[in-house]
Amino acid sequence: MNKIRKIRYILCCLLAVGIMGCSDDDNNSIVTGYEGILYNLAASVNATSQELWSTSPLVLDAKRTDAMEKLQDYADKCKADYFSVFLSGYDQTSLNMAKSDSILYFYRTAFERVLDGVKSSTVENGTAQIWLLYNMGYIIKTPSGCFGIDISHRWAEEFAPYLDFLCVTHKHSDHYSNNLIQAMYDLDKPVLSNYLQPVASYPFYSKKSEEYTIGNFKIRTCITNHNEASLKNFVTVFYIDCGDDAGGLTLIHTGDSNFKPVQYADITDANDVNHHVNVLIPRYAPNALTENDIIGTGTGQVTPDYVLLSHVLELSHADEEDSRWTVQSAWERASKINCQQTYVPMWGEKLVWKNGKLN
């Protein structure tokens, strides 16, 4: 049987399953066949999502553990090459794939939750909202502004109307979205990076440490090596003071930095930082707990109030050898970070900064 005949055969089988799968009576509707499979998948993932989102990233209890382990099981069935096809497919193709794969269904559901929250939420004065979209992609919304860092997502460009600026730590596709970047340019909104230069003398492009002010946000950067040894001066680390109306929230996002303190000094040793940050967002380091190298009071170090360990369940990576860290590994690593309040958030979750603490 040649390839064309095989494809026709498979399509005919799917059509037949779909036709046979519809039955109902006066009182009940039972969905079976292929439609039934999709219905059951959606119901199962929605239940897991609600179970997860009824918990807090700050409390790792049995309910949260159960929900995240279910998501891990979903992710284990999604291969990196399949995810690559999903990312590059036409919209309808990707939507259909998201309906038929559990972790992709959750990926889409989490996206819709964050997008709706960013669009519709009102941020109380003196507070800030911190959303995890996917991988190391965070969106922070304050009473006076909204920005994203390392937003990589199949539908990332839909956030462009709601972001005032975008930060990109480095040129690896699990940390940026070309569609979102272009949408930001089209709206004449700043994109801060060390490699994007849409026009000559673009003020938000730099390969050295910089300071920026955008609205109420004050931003410092430093340039660090990637954790892959050959990539020198490849990652921009961002320190962002979100302003008084955000309750004075400060955060550092490291991207895929290799955590060499000497490269952080332009941020950490600055007078306005003084070796302290409210929220540190590091990646799960593949090289033996080096996250702790930048935690402390010495040169190039900070003492964080909270650590949000990220780069977990990155579906574009094949396995843990390729930095697709499991939730179980993340919990173990979090327990070894030199900050008592270290947590592992999941896609679609929101934390609120209020009265000097995360809620």
Task: Name these PLM-found stretches.
Residues 2-11:
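Bacterial N-terminal signal peptides that target proteins for export
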Residues 18-21:
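C-terminal motif of bacterial Sec signal peptides marking the signal peptidase cleavage site
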Residues 23-132, 139-158, 165, 176-181, 192-248, 336, 344-350, ...:
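Metallo-beta-lactamase
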Residues 31-43, 204-215, 232, 265-266, ...:
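Binuclear metal-ion centers of metallo-dependent hydrolases, dominated by the metallo-beta-lactamase
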Residues 153-155, 225-302:
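Active-site-proximal loop/helix segments of hydrolase catalytic cores
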Residues 155-157, 172-176, 198-200, 212, ...:
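Active-site environment of divalent metal-dependent phosphoester hydrolases
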Residues 168, 188-197, 306-311:
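Short internal beta-strands
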